[in-house]
């Protein structure tokens, strides 16, 4: 994923917040996102890839909220962003050649790189017609 990101946006700065989330633990990923996103400057692009539903019918999203942009699966991981915020979301289109098992590399990383290069959110896909999935979740303090 990092190679794809840097190939698409060579000037990007990449920061790994954590690698301590158990595979598929969406609730922990949402918690960490809720505790960290606001510590970054406005305009930051956050790529979240905790995705046990890869290859399923779950949507792939890019969204804008709180002056930040976020890319990842519509599996509830964005729950902490959805409270008290105006959210603009687009559904990323799965192109030919995208692996059914590695959307992080083939779908989410190219979208994040496009945003880092100044592409508007709307260039990444159609407006998301649904409501991003929410977990039963208490926001962190």
Name each region found by the language model:
Residues 99-141:
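Anionic-ligand-binding alpha/beta catalytic cores of soluble enzymes and soluble regulatory domains
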Residues 7, 11, 39, 114-121:
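A structural signal for alpha-helix termini and helix-coil/disorder junctions
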Residues 11-13, 20-31, 35, 39-106:
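Active-site histidine-anchored catalytic micro-motif
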Residues 2, 6, 30-34, 78-79, ...:
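Predominant activation on well-ordered alpha-helical scaffold segments within soluble catalytic domains
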Residues 1-15:
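N-terminal glycine-rich anion-binding loops that anchor highly charged ligand groups
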């Amino acid at each position: 994923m990092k190679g794809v990101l840097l190939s698409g946006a060579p000037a990007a700065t990449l920061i790994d917040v954590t690698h301590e989330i158990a595979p598929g633990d969406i609730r922990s990923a949402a918690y960490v996102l809720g505790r960290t996103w606001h510590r970054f400057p406005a305009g930051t692009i956050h790529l979240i890839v905790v995705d046990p539903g890869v290859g399923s019918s779950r949507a792939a999203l890019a969204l804008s909220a709180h002056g930040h942009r976020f890319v990842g699966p519509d599996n509830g991981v964005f729950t902490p962003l959805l409270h008290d915020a105006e959210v603009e979301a687009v559904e990323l289109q799965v192109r030919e050649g995208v692996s059914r098992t590695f959307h992080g590399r083939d779908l989410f990383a190219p979208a994040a790189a496009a945003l880092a290069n100044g592409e508007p959110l709307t260039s990444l896909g159609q407006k998301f017609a649904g409501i991003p999935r929410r977990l039963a979740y208490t926001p962190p303090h």
